[in-house]
Amino acid sequence: MASTKEKLIAHVSKEQPAGPTNKVTVVGVGMVGMAAAVSILLKDLTDELALVDVMEDKLKGEAMDLQHGSLFLKTHKIVADKDYSVTANSKVVVVTAGARQQEGESRLNLVQRNVNIFKFIIPNIIKYSPNCILLVVSNPVDILTYVAWKLSGLPRNRVIGSGTNLDSARFRYLMGEKLGIHPSSCHGWVVGEHGDSSVPVWSGVNVAGVSLQALNPDLGTDKDKEDWKSVHKMVVDSAYEVIKLKGYTSWAIGMSVADLCESILKNMHKCHPVSTLVKGMHGVNEEVFLSVPCILGNNGLTDVVHMTLKPEEEKQLVKSAETLWGVQKELTL
């Protein structure tokens, strides 16, 4: 006897099974992972989303919750499992898993705890998606991007840290608040470490091509009567402030991740401040990952933009590198 489905549908041709073309995996279904997953779904970036976590009940619950919203999405397949085989053939793998940053804890304090987690995660990702682009979000992101690069064996263009993409977004938002202008019209870059020793490039801050430093030569210095330096201080303090108020950060970093995924999956050749290997650049001699302006496309990180930094900015960048290297060289990989 024919089933309801057979009575309803008349097959015209046999469907040829085809794999996903823009599959994205998110490893870790905590607050950041789910904010990233939702942001990716709402941007219609992927034809298949895979979620992975060791906490099976939470993983299943988050996946079901997203699947129940399928009517409102254009991603037709959302899958989840603690087994990494579910991630097979991913174009981009977003790694958010790791120990959560506690109130008042620096990102660098998190490091060895998360390195040990990465020793399990990264080989499993590569086993099932050897051609993927790794986007590392877990903190401390610059060191863990280096760790992912070492553990994965992937070329440097395919291991990217979310870096200061969010720091720069925070900077532009706060700059816009000070000027009464939308952040998209406020241009400024925060480079270096994602976190406490990040470097604001005051020499490049502009609106409509008008350099703010040309209008205010003391911009960003202690002599500045308008105290623009406090804008960067607020960028550095903002994560700690949000954690203090709500216990974690999630939405802004989730949107930042989706922004980076869009540039990769749509081959946009867009410039982002993301974490990459900077040895040999700007006086950095150590094998460290720091954020500099990079072009992102289908092959991952395709180019690095040569910034013109003032001596004091370059000095800060080198100091950032030395801070990270001091921690990195002690790691057990």
Swiss-Prot record:
Enzyme class: oxidoreductase
Catalyzed chemical reaction(s): (S)-lactate + NAD(+) = pyruvate + NADH + H(+)
Gene Ontology biological process terms, A to Z: lactate metabolic process; pyruvate metabolic process; response to hypoxia
Binding, NAD(+): 30-58, 100, 139
InterPro entries assigned: L-lactate/malate_DH (IPR001557), L-lactate_DH (IPR011304), L-lactate_DH_AS (IPR018177), Lactate/malate_DH_C (IPR022383), Lactate/malate_DH_N (IPR001236), Lactate_DH/Glyco_Ohase_4_C (IPR015955), NAD(P)-bd_dom_sf (IPR036291)
Residues that bind substrate: 107, 139, 170, 249
Known EC number: 1.1.1.27
GO cellular component terms, semicolon-separated: mitochondrion
MF (Gene Ontology): L-lactate dehydrogenase activity
Active site: 194 (proton acceptor)
Compartment list: Cytoplasm
Pathway: Fermentation; pyruvate fermentation to lactate; (S)-lactate from pyruvate: step 1/1
Alphabetical keyword list: Cytoplasm, NAD, Oxidoreductase
CDD domains: LDH_1
Keyword Cytoplasm: yes
Keyword Cytoplasm in record: yes
Subunit field text: Homotetramer.
NCBIfam families cross-referenced by the UniProt entry: L-LDH-NAD, PRK00066.1
Function: Interconverts simultaneously and stereospecifically pyruvate and lactate with concomitant interconversion of NADH and NAD(+).
Family the UniProt entry places it in: Belongs to the LDH/MDH superfamily. LDH family.
HAMAP family listed in its UniProt record: Lactate_dehydrog
Protein name listed in UniProt: L-lactate dehydrogenase A chain
Organism encoding this protein: Danio rerio
